[in-house]
């Protein structure tokens, strides 16, 4: 541990103890006081929280602390998510003696060997990391109200979740039925993002299976995402070296890759009859079930047996890979199906030739495929003459009937409509089917098993596909603030594709499903409205309510205002006054003002949060804001246990101290960006914070009582402007922007001031105290120390936001002085050996104000000599918007007073003594005839060497 880190750790411990003793972060509802209620995602205690969690919690804490300075009652609570399989899976691995897991936990999290032996018990493991994570949050300086802490397996919480689920069921939003889900074969249970390694959400997609059959009736099911192109098939592909099987699948005998047979076994009945190499089937002919044409099966090593069924249909007119492969073997036959503006009859051929692709192994084929598929899906229309390809093997009138159907629903239709039609038609005609797959595979369960798709028959689902519910969810997204704003599109997209989602399991920790024995509500379903529970749990404990008293009537009254306290009291035995108090506390805190989490939770938790709020609460209780931050890398690499580069939050605090760590997580990237945490940056920020502390010490020791000078007023004004920018940044959740202003820009302003004055003034101390208030959300421990050092009363965490007002004249004075220094340095005579600089000022500021409108006549009318008016107007025109606006805001400006105030500063900048005269003063010497050169804001300059 470095001395710098030790200093900040001790500072943190000092102020954390004082905050806890004063209970400053335990707010009570206060009539007439505005509130701000913010939450961040509660962690799974299956391991210690790391700096990625720390970033999310820091952003929430910054907002919480900022809103306290605005005079609001701020509630920032925290809890722990015990539900589901993450804890159970790790505990099982430890109990089974999994050396990798044991080694990781000892190396990364520093778990002692004697503790590891106890962690085969999932509840022991959860409580261990629960307490470790809580300590880390406290050491990190989070302003959390710990009186509302809970776990998701507390009996009171379980009653709350059961109430929520009964509400959803009564609204028809929980259903039971057949649906594909991500599935862990080892544990025989559905999985979501929080059950997988790296929290990867299984993306379930749908292949259309098209049944091509050989002359013996053996089916070769081609798996495709583009079933509308089946009319253009000229051959089939199979990997000759691949492992295949002949199997019975749902009563049909077919050829599948061995991997596909395994995956399909979770979706239907699969009976493997025999195994075979792919080469056995190369050379056979199969019949296209739509056109009746017989096409050959070719061998191709590019076919991946793990994708789809391992049987691929070839459409060279519209698939660049197929075109290139068939060109290589000299077997191209093209059947045009889709018209796309900007392409000829054969889009695949056009793109392959335009991109000069030489063979089927050319990497550019990937880009070519994306281009063709995207263009055809977005703008493509099926050709009218494709009808002639349909049903050539069928007798009349069957063929005419099928052609009529295709003419009506397929020919001339946009590709997306044709695709939907033919998928349904193939299934209904018994010529095809559906295969579900993990499209972003491989995805692994936390136990290490690869996830598959299983079609469940009697599973409980939350039906996020319900159209009216989707519309309500979209309405909330439209109304609420989303940070970053561009994430709104992702929320809308997620709402569109969400469908039924398995909400209960037969395994894991959590809340029992109230109406179906043996089912446990899963972790992404019991964590959607728990923010409301924070608002009432303190009251539940204060009034010593028992879990069995927390009935439907209790929750209906507290959250929805159904019934009266007296009616609910009669049914629950809870005193009416207690009910009224709990209801009033909920009414005070809700709705939630900000929900903070990582951007990876947009496709699941954050969208479920939206859905469940609109389903259960009235509109006035819908949440107001979501903040979704980017990921955290470490030294340019993704953190992972396998790389041993995960940095637990408590270790990071020990390495750098809380405030340097907070500053680094705040300043290294804007909220929506991924943040690369670097050691060198953390050390640099620690040094910068230390320099702020040293500055505060100097101010406390050397400040003097005196009338404020131009320099003092400039300091106040510059910091006032900076604090306006900081406030705007905080309000817009631009945390990095605020941190840059606070740690570096304002420090530079103070450094410039301290260089220019012999001793700082008491006004400078007051300005530094204002800085400490604004700095507090990012570096609260240092801010408290600075505030205390400078004589601030109470805690800075409770101080009101500073009300500094910039003085335009003081700002103009500094801009003017810097312009003069720059003008002197541009003169050829300036350089080494200068003995003195003499400045002649023209005191007629009214001329400058008249010149602002860029009109020479106006300047002359204001008294400007005609021979100077044009020069003055041109000068003012070049000053820039900021200086011009300051001139407009200032009634009168004394250049001589400004220069004399900044005399030390100017002399240091020029490296020579400086004398200042008024050009109109007849007693002043006219050195070099420079008096007549003086214009307002542009002195005459004489340099003596």
From Swiss-Prot:
It catalyses: tRNA(Leu) + L-leucine + ATP = L-leucyl-tRNA(Leu) + AMP + diphosphate. One of its GO terms (cellular component) is cytoplasm. InterPro entries: aa-tRNA-synth_I_CS, aa-tRNA-synth_Ia, Leu-tRNA-lgase_arc, Leu-tRNA-synth_Ia_arc/euk, M/V/L/I-tRNA-synth_anticd-bd, Rossmann-like_a/b/a_fold, tRNAsynth_Ia_anticodon-bd, Val/Leu/Ile-tRNA-synth_edit. Its EC number is 6.1.1.4. One of its GO terms (molecular function) is aminoacyl-tRNA deacylase activity. Its main location: cytoplasm. One of its GO terms (biological process) is leucyl-tRNA aminoacylation. Belongs to the class-I aminoacyl-tRNA synthetase family. A motif ('HIGH' region) lies at residues 43-53. SUPFAM superfamilies: Anticodon-binding domain of a subclass of class I aminoacyl-tRNA synthetases, Nucleotidylyl transferase, ValRS/IleRS/LeuRS editing domain. It is found in: Cytoplasm. This is Leucine--tRNA ligase. A motif ('KMSKS' region) lies at residues 638-642. Keywords: Aminoacyl-tRNA synthetase, ATP-binding, Cytoplasm, Ligase, Nucleotide-binding, Protein biosynthesis. ATP binds at residue 641. The keyword ATP-binding applies. PANTHER family: LEUCINE--TRNA LIGASE, CYTOPLASMIC, LEUCYL-TRNA SYNTHETASE.
